[in-house]
Amino acid sequence: MKKRTRRPSNPIWIAFLVLAIVAMIYFNQVVVPDMPTFFSPSATPTRSQESLVNEAQSYFTQGKLSQSISSYEQAVRADPRNPAIFIELARTQIFAGLYQEAVTNAENALLLNPTNSMAYAIKASALDYLGNYADAELAVNKAIELDPNNASAYAYYTEILLDQGNYEDIQTAIDISQKAQALDPNALETHRARGYVLFNTGNYPEAIQEYQAAIAINDKLWDLHYSLGAVYKMQGEADLAVQEMLTGVALNPTNPDILTEISRTYASEGQYGKAIQYAEQALSLDPSSPRLHGNLGVMLYQNDNYSKAVDQLKLVVNGGTTSDGVIVEGMPLAPGRIADDYYSIYALSLTQLDRCADAIPIMQVILTNIATDQVAYYNATQGMDYCRTSSGTPSAGVTPTP
């Protein structure tokens, strides 16, 4: 009998096996030992992973994200070698705003299965929320490479592109969202991505339909109500906007962003008293946030309370310590809301207090460094003209560009 010739070793395959073995050794020696034991030894029988996963899914459906996360973590401890549980845990953590933790658990899933498309997709979404857009794109493209039919990956890719603010190539985001829709038209992530792209293209009625469809799948997720409220606001339906955002607050009462958007919604309707109320509530949740001090300062300015506006806005521009001893770090000048609202409104507030000597240097910084920001440039120019004509004496006041 002729002896069969052995096939020559494939160096690429050998390298892959070596990497896989290294990953498993790392996971067994580093990741698994680091997981705390949930149950102490007792006569009580250990719950099955299936039972814990079912419980986690039930909590998720109810919008009880912290309980869902806890159950998934227990399921991981019951079987730390199941990548699917790490993926579901990471997905839930994203909805709960625990983005760095989500990245970690998506990577844990990849240690167990380096070719898992969904693990890459979830990691990409978490990185997007962290503002790490370059790595998010790398991860989501890897997810699509591994599984070109992964609808969630296309949905996340849509959001990553839009979050970068590059609207010159918005057609790419539209096309990718339509790809997600073609692959899985009924998925929550698909509806959310389509709603987001329709919102950013000004198609508000269609965006509302998509967010409503997502909410019909799970009406206990705060970010869906928040997003729907934002669309209603842009469509001029302030009452519906506030209603949806308050639902978001009920589901996530510790998130200051929702309260901040409610304050801006009321301000857009000229209801500055309510705007200040919600801005103060938002600030109470995170008193060290310069952004929240800035939002409150803008609301106070719009309500003609210039002295209190200055107290808040100077913390944004210069940093400092609040009356309660909370340290606030200043925000460097940058185009957009920081310049348009915080810096220029701070300068305009100073002019209304006959403090042009303090206001002019701020306006000069704006005019010198970010003259391309049309809103900030206009506000600074108006303030400079006011100071020149009034010699620091307030009269009719200065109205900033909205």
Region locations from a protein language model:
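Structural marker of alpha-solenoid helical repeat scaffolds
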Residues: 78, 112, 146, 183, ...
